[in-house]
Amino acid sequence: LDQASTILSLDCDFIGGEADAHRHIRDFAKGRKLNNGRTDMSRLYVVEPRMTQTGANADHRLRVKAGFVHGVASAIARGLGIKGLEAQPLPESVKDGWMDQCVDDLKKGGVVMAGHGQPEEVHVLAHAINQKIGAIGSGVQFLPAPNSGYGTIKDLAEASFDVLLILGGNPAYSAPADIDWKKLIDGKKVVRLGYYDDESAVDADLFLAQTHFLEEWGDARTSDGTTVAVRPLIKPLFDGLSELEVLAHIAGVAKT
């Protein structure tokens, strides 16, 4: 954001309620300062249904219902020359002058951000606009997505297994209605790691008490791809196990 001359927020409260707000605030503030040879501040356009911290800092704010954000994004995309888009409904309150000025500023370079509450269509348009204005690779960086190649509970129902290890969750309660959980685990050895004596714990042959996340070591990945260590805040109150410890024991690692 500190490099963008124009920022368009499509119902994205990046200063307040969105993820990584602390980083976005810092970068946005840098773009608003006239120093280090910079003579122009970044310009912020915000399209949103309610007042947010981002909207309060906007140079140009357009208030529309959440369902009309798609229409505004589509109109801006078509104004930038993106082909193959159909006109979407817009409220009468949207003025052509606002849209034209936003399009003109985006042509000079910028970045578009879509909020997590907006549908897939709005995010696709945001990516298309970023591609059109040359933001990909500069203001927008893509990172490898986390491994999503895990199976589903329906895959489990169709699989052949003897031992089922449940790490957290409560599938006995939350499994889809078309999955007969009792039948699925019939004759199987079920081991459950969890916090509570819930429905899945009742069905388990062996229940392992799980440590609270504030009691365990771990690792995580930030939004910019940085791997970080997670330290416990307190010593375990009880003699529980974390998910990593259980998996380590299964893998034959004596000490974690």
What are the residue ranges of the model-derived segments?
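Non-catalytic alpha/beta scaffold blocks inside enzyme catalytic domains
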Residues: L1-T256
